[in-house]
Swiss-Prot record:
This is NADH-ubiquinone oxidoreductase chain 4L. It is a multi-pass membrane protein. It comes from the Eukaryota. Core subunit of the mitochondrial membrane respiratory chain NADH dehydrogenase (Complex I) which catalyzes electron transfer from NADH through the respiratory chain, using ubiquinone as an electron acceptor. Part of the enzyme membrane arm which is embedded in the lipid bilayer and involved in proton translocation. One of its GO terms (cellular component) is mitochondrial inner membrane. It comes from Hemiechinus auritus (Long-eared hedgehog). It holds the Pfam family Oxidored_q2. It catalyses: a ubiquinone + NADH + 5 H(+)(in) = a ubiquinol + NAD(+) + 4 H(+)(out). It is found in: Mitochondrion inner membrane. Coiled coil: none annotated. Core subunit of respiratory chain NADH dehydrogenase (Complex I) which is composed of 45 different subunits. GO terms for molecular function: NADH dehydrogenase (ubiquinone) activity. The keyword Transferase does not apply. Belongs to the complex I subunit 4L family.
Amino acid sequence: MSIVYMNVMLAFMIALIGTLLYRHHLMSSLMCLEGMMLAMYIFISLISLNMHFTTMYMVPLIILVFAACEAALGLALLVKMFNYYGNDYVQNLNLLKC
């Protein structure tokens, strides 16, 4: 396994650990999720280009679409939460309240 693949997997693992450790604020959780999506995009792009999988050339674009949707929904939730509560603490997100 080359050093590029190792670096991409390390970036994914660091973003995953960041998601687990810094879950106090919603903004830091969203940034770690974006880091994970970016690492997945780079990894799948490298695999599809190096292995010449012609059927997988569209998969990185689909991942980018999902990452953009996730970012838009996350930022909309962040703005709504900040307007309602005045902070971005994840502990304020309670799905049992209606």
